[in-house]
C-alpha cells in the first residue's frame, strides 16, 4: 500500500517539489530500486487473457519466465540510458505489518472467488481484472531474479526488513542518488529523492515522477516528524486508518495541531473512532529508525557480465533464445565499455536557484543496525525468453 493518497496530495499541495522526467535524464545516476515492486510490475504487465484463459509469458517447457524477462529487458533499457540500477530485496516483514499482510492475503482470496464467479458468468473483462489481483511471486522466483542480476553484474542488496527503508538508507549514505519504487513510504523513510514509474515499460508512456523530500518539507512547512505523522494518518502499512479522515483533513490537522498526538486529542470521539490497534508511536519510530544494513557497510560494485553463466542459466535452464541472450550481453558490454562524459554536477558545485535536483534534505532517524546481509553486486544485461502460452488458472 505504501502511503494512501500521498502522491495526489503532494501534487495538490506541493506541486513544485515534483518533476516529470524522461529516463535519459538519469544518465550516470545510481538508483536503488525496490526489487519486489519491480518484479510484480513485470509479472502483472506480461499477464494476458485470451479465450477465457489466463496467459503468462512462458518458455517452450511451459515454465513461467515473465519475472526474468521483465527484469532482463528493463534493466537493459536503464543501462542503455546510462542509469546504474541497484536492486534491493525485501527481508523479513516487521511485526507491525502483520495486519496489512493478512489483509492482502484476504484480498487475494476475495479476488479468487470473484474470478470464479466471473468465469461462471462468462465475464472475460472481470476475469482478467481479478486474475491480475491474484498474482503472487514466490520465493523461488525472487531467488531466480537475484541469480540473473548477479550474472548480469548488477548489484543486489538483501535488506533485513523493508526494501524501501534499505533503499532510503543507501540514498542517505550517498550510495545511491534516488529510490525507485511505487510505494510513497520511501519518502517517510527519509529518501531525499524518490522516482515513480521508473520500471514501467515503454507501452505505458508515462513520465517518471521525481519527488524531492527537502522541497516537500520546505513547501509544506512540516518537520520530518510531522511529515511522518501525516503519512501515518493518511494510511500506511503499519497501522489501521482512522475512518473518515481524508487526505486534506489529515494535512490541515497536522498543520494546525503540530503532531499526531495533539490531532487525535482534538477529534470528536462521537464522530471519529481511533482503532484500538492504532499504534502510531511504534509506526513513527519504525519510520525514523527502521531495521537496515548501515549504508557504509554495503559495497556497491558493478561488474562484467558472466557470459558463460548467463548462457547456462537463461538458455540451457530457462530455454531463452540464445541469440537474444547474446544480443543482450553485447548491449550491456557496449554500455559499460562506452567512454561517456560524467555528469557535470559530479565535477562542479552548482548554486541552487529556487529548485535544485541535487538538493540535500534533512533526514531524520538513525538505524537499528541488525543482522542484514549485503549480497555482492554484479552488472549486466539479459535478453528475453520464450513464447506466450496459455496457463490455465
UniProtKB/Swiss-Prot annotation:
PTMs per UniProt: Phosphorylated. Phosphorylation upon DNA damage induces relocalization to the nuclear plasma.
Region described as I-domain: spans on this chain: 126-257
Nuclease recorded as keyword: yes
BP-aspect Gene Ontology terms: base-excision repair; DNA replication, removal of RNA primer
Cofactor(s) for this UniProt protein: Mg(2+)
SUPFAM superfamilies to which the protein is assigned, alphabetical: 5' to 3' exonuclease, C-terminal subdomain (SSF47807), PIN domain-like (SSF88723)
Basic and acidic residues bias (residue ranges): 99-120
Subunit and partners: Interacts with PCNA. Three molecules of FEN1 bind to one PCNA trimer with each molecule binding to one PCNA monomer. PCNA stimulates the nuclease activity without altering cleavage specificity.
A GO-annotated cellular component: mitochondrion
Organism: Trypanosoma brucei brucei (strain 927/4 GUTat10.1)
Family (UniProt): Belongs to the XPG/RAD2 endonuclease family. FEN1 subfamily.
Protein name according to UniProt: Flap endonuclease 1
Location of the region described as Disordered in the Swiss-Prot/TrEMBL record: 99-127, 358-393
EC category name: hydrolase
Cofactor note as given: Binds 2 magnesium ions per subunit. They probably participate in the reaction catalyzed by the enzyme. May bind an additional third magnesium ion after substrate binding.
Region of interest called N-domain, as start-end residue ranges on this chain: 1-108
Keyword DNA damage: yes
Feature: compositional bias, Basic residues: 384-393
HAMAP family xref list: Fen (MF_00614)
Keywords associated with the record: DNA damage, DNA repair, DNA replication, Endonuclease, Exonuclease, Hydrolase, Magnesium, Metal-binding, Mitochondrion, Nuclease, Nucleus, Phosphoprotein
List of residues binding Mg(2+) 2: 183, 185, 237
Function: Structure-specific nuclease with 5'-flap endonuclease and 5'-3' exonuclease activities involved in DNA replication and repair. During DNA replication, cleaves the 5'-overhanging flap structure that is generated by displacement synthesis when DNA polymerase encounters the 5'-end of a downstream Okazaki fragment. It enters the flap from the 5'-end and then tracks to cleave the flap base, leaving a nick for ligation. Also involved in the long patch base excision repair (LP-BER) pathway, by cleaving within the apurinic/apyrimidinic (AP) site-terminated flap.
Binding, Mg(2+) 1: 34, 90, 162, 164
Subcellular location: Nucleus, Nucleolus; Nucleus, Nucleoplasm; Mitochondrion
E.C. number: 3.1.-.-
Superkingdom as given in the UniProt entry: Eukaryota
